[in-house]
Amino acid sequence: MKLKRGKPKEKFSYDPQKVLKKLEDLAYKILEEVKAGKNPYFDVPTRGLSNVYFDEEARLIKLGDKLSRRYFLNVAHARKFMQTLILMAYVKRLVSEGKHASLREAYYANKHTIPGTHENTFEDQSESDPIIEDLERMLGVLREEMHITADRRGYVYGDIVIKDGEDEFNASKLGMGGWAVPGTVEHIQFPEINVDYVLVVETAAMADRLIEEKYPKRERALIIATQGQASRGVRRLIHRLHYEEGLPIIVFTDGDPYGWYIYSTIKQGSINLAYLSEKLATPDAKFVGMTMDDIKEYGLEHVTEKLKGIPPDKKGGPTGDYKRLIEELNYPWFQNKEWQRQLKLALKWGVRIEQQALANKSLEFVAKEYLPEKIREGKLLP
């Protein structure tokens, strides 16, 4: 199976004026309702499992069309209504001035005592973060497009030129640590790409091993280390590299329910961020490993780890890894025969297999045999 760069399917262009227009339209709506003597309100798409579904055609977890109405003249709603307007004004200022703020900074910048009262606008960041998510859903824009960011996590290594503001650099010339993925990647451009595909790797240790073994250069691959669950910035970057630059996406995680869930969120999106799946998820992604079949195929039986928790056939079960496996068995996006086989084998054998277990063969085995052979032979899960 020869991987090669395909044709771009979409082109993203960040336009701050569109974000400002959406903010202003919503603000004018509230203003007109006040002028007309009406009770102003926001319609907020409802969060929660009851308003989430799997779109089989798009292969994405999506948010449904249920709305909750938040009124100003309602004791139960008034505080959140006020907080929403405060953060709308703050976002407008950030976008207009071209500045960015972290979630923590957004909280502190808008926390103050309301004049003439003993009430604070926000008591804790747990109040401001959900309002920012509400704005994402109401406006149909990413938090990052509103110039609000989270901490950096994950890094990129490979022969790709990245333009970040006024800086331009090759991600294979920055040392083994590569380029740290920022909280927002909306402004990032890719003037030159000399790779055939993206290999998304769960652990930094495995990514470092592949870099040390010269895998990116030899296989013309771009390595993206997620360092655990992929951050929004990493997921958005993966999405853009596939849809805008035509790069195939292959995911490599531990062979356990947590690693498979990491793959699931990259491919289909997540329930918590269902409203962002079309901008964060990459349904065309494929999975190379680790799988239960790898254990016997490569003679790794003696380096497996036991699943954590109580099995379903024992008193108090299922818990831990077993509970997550059963949940994944029932996910609509894991109903194909290939994934049903892997999940059922994990339950039957009661084991998990880590990426690093391949070092039992040799340090270079993963880079020179395991990955190249599986990818070349097309041994990938959907």
Swiss-Prot record:
Top enzyme category: isomerase
Binding site for Mg(2+): E202, D254
CDD domains: TOPRIM_TopoIIB_SPO (cd00223)
Keywords from the named record: ATP-binding, DNA-binding, Isomerase, Magnesium, Metal-binding, Nucleotide-binding, Topoisomerase
GO molecular function annotations of the record: ATP binding; DNA binding; DNA topoisomerase type II (double strand cut, ATP-hydrolyzing) activity; magnesium ion binding
Annotated EC: 5.6.2.2
GO terms for cellular component: chromosome
SUPFAM superfamilies linked to this entry: DNA topoisomerase IV, alpha subunit
Active site location: Y108 (o-(5'-phospho-dna)-tyrosine intermediate)
Domain of life (superkingdom): Archaea
Reactions listed under catalytic activity: ATP-dependent breakage, passage and rejoining of double-stranded DNA
Cofactor(s) required for function per UniProt: Mg(2+)
Keyword Magnesium (UniProt): yes
GO BP term, example: DNA topological change
Domain Topo IIA-type catalytic: residue ranges: 14-155
Family: Belongs to the TOP6A family.
Subunit field text: Homodimer. Heterotetramer of two Top6A and two Top6B chains.
Function: Relaxes both positive and negative superturns and exhibits a strong decatenase activity.
Protein name (record): Type 2 DNA topoisomerase 6 subunit A
